[in-house]
């Protein structure tokens, strides 16, 4: 039997999604709680592995099990055994052909910037603080140069293990709500650090340090060293994963909760 779950988590206290030796991860905590409910070892597969300090409101996982439990066990029961920073949002029995990673057709991330002279006292782990005068309209205009399929070598981490640097960006928008600026980007898949590297370069344009066409130049040059520094992890959220309609995967509000959809 294959089970899919929707997972929300605050990644600030974890080494990232992926299970690792001697350090705590979201995956390790989730598998521990699931194994307690199933009374057998459970291993999960996720839609997208997030880095240390990165959050998720729309992470999707699947696992296989031989035991039958009511939906309440996989939600309320698992949540009772999880730390407060991780929560199951929904559960669905799925066909064995469903795969959380390989069945996905798109992923969507949101990066939230707190643009204010002074650092925040609340939500400090869920925002990235930048105090300069940021022009979000310039950032949005520049971001449109990312649309379509490109070689994103300039925006991939040096240690990225992906065989191909090509990715297809479907949508990208930069909006402001008061002191909050949100970069919202959807693509078929993302390279390691791709979103944070894109945000770092868009910020340079928004701050007036680079021209509007800089993104196109960076795409063309295919050199990570030419782009801006990687943006901080704490403002980044995996908010949605898209699957073919045949799987009927539940859809919730994108989040994060303090931002309007």
Swiss-Prot record:
Q: Which UniProt keywords apply?
A: Isomerase, tRNA processing
EC? 5.4.99.12
| EC top class, as a word | isomerase
MF term (GO), any:
tRNA pseudouridine(38-40) synthase activity
Q: Which reaction does it catalyse?
A: uridine(38/39/40) in tRNA = pseudouridine(38/39/40) in tRNA
Entry keyword annotation includes Ubl conjugation: no
Which Pfam family is one of those matched by this entry?
A: PseudoU_synth_1
Task: Identify this protein by name.
Answer: tRNA pseudouridine synthase A
| Species assigned in the record | Shewanella denitrificans (strain OS217 / ATCC BAA-1090 / DSM 15013)
Name of the gene: truA
């Amino acid at each position: 039997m294959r089970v899919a779950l929707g997972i929300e988590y605050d990644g600030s206290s974890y080494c990232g999604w992926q299970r690792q030796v001697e350090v705590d991860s979201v995956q390790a905590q989730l598998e521990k709680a699931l194994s307690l409910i199933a009374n057998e070892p459970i291993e999960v597969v996720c839609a997208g592995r997030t880095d240390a300090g990165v959050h998720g409101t729309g992470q999707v996982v699947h696992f296989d099990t031989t035991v039958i439990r009511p939906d309440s066990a996989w939600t309320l029961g698992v949540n009772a055994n999880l730390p407060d920073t991780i929560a199951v949002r929904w559960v669905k029995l799925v066909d064995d052909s469903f795969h959380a990673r390989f069945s996905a057709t798109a992923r969507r991330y949101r990066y939230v910037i707190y643009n204010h002279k002074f650092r925040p006292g609340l939500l400090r782990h869920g925002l990235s603080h930048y105090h300069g005068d940021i022009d979000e309209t310039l950032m949005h205009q520049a971001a449109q140069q990312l649309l379509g399929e490109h070689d994103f070598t300039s925006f991939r981490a040096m240690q990225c293990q992906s065989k191909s640097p090509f990715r297809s960006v479907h949508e990208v928008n930069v909006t402001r709500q008061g002191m909050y600026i949100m970069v919202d980007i959807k693509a078929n898949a993302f390279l390691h650090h791709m979103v944070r590297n894109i945000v770092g370069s868009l910020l340079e344009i928004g701050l007036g340090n680079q021209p509007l066409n800089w993104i196109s130049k960076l795409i063309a040059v295919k050199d990570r060293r030419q782009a801006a520094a990687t943006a901080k992890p704490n403002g980044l959220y995996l908010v949605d994963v898209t699957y073919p309609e045949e799987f009927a995967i539940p859809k919730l509000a994108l989040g994060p909760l303090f931002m309007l959809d």
